[in-house]
């Protein structure tokens, strides 16, 4: 009583406290960063190593395995995967959430150093690492095009100057430059000319390496001067290499230009990048795992004027893709939804109270509670994102509930003729405990979410804390500012004044009277209501089992990403043609705004494409509908497939895949994996629940096996090292020397000119110089035959691995897909040597599915414990919790009606309903207990009176919560995929709960009261006088 009076009778102090909360909130709002979702990126580090010309199997055994053994000892590694392809190995380390990325990077460098002695010689550089996830979609793609500059020169400028500058921007984790490679001097040898001159490839390589030397020469010094010695020991251009003498034949000099074509070219000619049908260099920018995407993009955009200033006029720099516009649009939609929710909630209050002054009170209390929450969000290190703003949108209905309960009770006393300050004090005292009970029990719902681990726990933590803080501030405001404003702004009125019977008031009276009549009938037919109540419990269980489930709603971010997978024996020239064909098909689609892509490198038969769609307001279709339309057109392209998927704000796992979900096969026996993977992939491809099924296991690449006759080689004076060196020099694009320039280092690349290696007959023209200096053709000591070989070798941990990726057809949920895969694996009878498990997002979904029921039960148990403490009773909390089954039925039926799967967002809605619908029961039970204690009423009379007295605030709070969530259901535009499931769940649960709990709660109250009396009689013992 004294606590409430302190604020009621000190209006200036109360107003200043509210103003301070508001000002802190405004400051916090201005300082909060912006993001699509809470920070949930796993710390990921990518280790890269190269050995040009080495086969995938060689890279896996000699490079990947030693590194994996060393890296696998690092603490906190959640998952380690590797992929080895032609001349390249990439290892992805995913760490636990609690692992600091910088500390992990230091451990990674130490592990690389420890494995260095086990790595093969001939590697052009030490393994390197980057703090970025290569499977993440780039946050921005820049393109460089030019009519006059070569692709190699553009690539050099991009990688040497632009990429270095961009990498220094806060938040940037990796700048991957694609579309070509660094400039190089390429030496294309003529095997026939070499044979005629008696020059071996090794002799050419040694001559070039010896002629291009960068060594310190020292200085000459006398008593007065010092001269630095400088020589022309370096060759920098093709023109300088051409006259190089590499051999003498009968006293005549053989120059490099006599036996080779020497050109200024690039290190790897098998690379191509394009943007909208034009050759281009791509700068694909990815953020650090812990970085904010909006701040990072803003930093890049702020740097663009400086970048454009340093670019020559012949180069055109454009932004081909930017993830931030759709994120900003989505957040703007949520902010508008929040404003609409506040307006609707205040409208509900006005319609019920029919007073401008009375409506002004919650109109002040709601913004103070919501704005004050921003300060706490800033202190907690949160961001303005879809989930935190959705929490505030839902909180609109919650925070007004507390003000409504206090305001309505004070208004009831004023209508009875009590003076304003006295009514404020008396009304607040009566419902103070009720408001505290509602708020604390609502916050208790979110305690299990705060304790939840893994990605779902990290994802929902901001939502739970934001909502809890808003409720906490609302509780304080409702018990301080609201009664003060009621006491000083509202006026007393005569009992049963006429306005109560006008408009909405008349309707409310009629509803209340009808409710009273129906409630009497219900209380006389409690068994029927009991059957209905038990039926809702059973229906909950059945609906939860039957409803399709997924991890997170499929988002339309306006960006598509596609992986190209072509025939495994395709040439680079043919692959480049496939890239152009696919780009033309996509570019012709009316919903596409921009398309970029690249192919080449270590995986000749693959490529990547990035597609920017037009804004949502300029297209009718969703991203998934566009993918479905394009899939039909793209399937007509022979010899290659393009797998499209919508880029999501949440992507789990470090392994790159051509689809959204992955199922990984592991085995310690590589032959067993290679035997069963095609069978499993074929079976999964036939499932109607899966689309775009593909695998990263590619074992049918064309290979030419050379079999050495070691006896013949020994007789001819040739060793295996010389033969292998011949092949590497001929076909391996061997980097034989380094050209040092002020801004970068470039390579001299040697191979037999591709004109002479167009078919297998090129092997017949190869020869080795033996120990006696004679040229011995390769065919003298080797035979060759075609075979199949893997284009890549993949590991997970230290086991051989193959990942089958898949998308979901329209109308199929992830739960249906995972059940179909598990069923198929059982039917196939896969041996124990091959183990299958979901990975990435599908793995997190499986883990979430296993914990969903536990989380719901934990939330209910937590609420029960809190209510038990507040009411000092085991029975009354059960009465309050009896409202939950009807809400669950309504939520699940609404999801089925709107064809929405049960996702993590819908789970949030269920948790919220646990907190919302019990408020009705709390108001009924509180007043019934008070009536029994102070009024001497029977339980039947008490609960009947409580239901009628609390009918108006129950209707107000329920409608306020319903109208607060309704804009989420009706919202469209960017990000609506996240908002709608939450709104559908809450609205459906509230409607069903309101229809049933007004009748089931009083029946359950009487049932437990009778049960309590019967139990107390059985346990009572007669008193015996002594």
UniProtKB/Swiss-Prot annotation:
Domain of life: Bacteria
Gene3D superfamilies given in the database record: Multidrug efflux transporter AcrB pore domain, Multidrug efflux transporter AcrB pore domain like, Multidrug efflux transporter AcrB TolC docking domain, DN and DC subdomains, Multidrug efflux transporter AcrB transmembrane domain
InterPro entries: AcrB_DN_DC_subdom (IPR027463), Acrflvin-R (IPR001036), Multidrug-R_MdtC (IPR023931)
Compartment list: Cell inner membrane
Matches recorded under Pfam families: ACR_tran
Membrane topology term: Multi-pass membrane protein
TM segment ranges: 15-35, 333-353, 360-380, 387-407, 431-451, 463-483, 528-548, 853-873, 897-917, 953-973, 984-1004
GO cellular component, as recorded: plasma membrane
Keyword NADP: no
Molecular-function GO terms, alphabetical: xenobiotic transmembrane transporter activity
Major subcellular site: membrane
Keyword annotations from UniProtKB, A to Z: Cell inner membrane, Cell membrane, Membrane, Transmembrane, Transmembrane helix, Transport
PANTHER family on file: MULTIDRUG RESISTANCE PROTEIN MDTC (PTHR32063:SF34), PTHR32063
Subunit and interaction comment: Part of a tripartite efflux system composed of MdtA, MdtB and MdtC. MdtC forms a heteromultimer with MdtB.
Family: Belongs to the resistance-nodulation-cell division (RND) (TC 2.A.6) family. MdtC subfamily.
Name of the protein in its database record: Multidrug resistance protein MdtC
Protein source organism: Salmonella paratyphi A (strain AKU_12601)
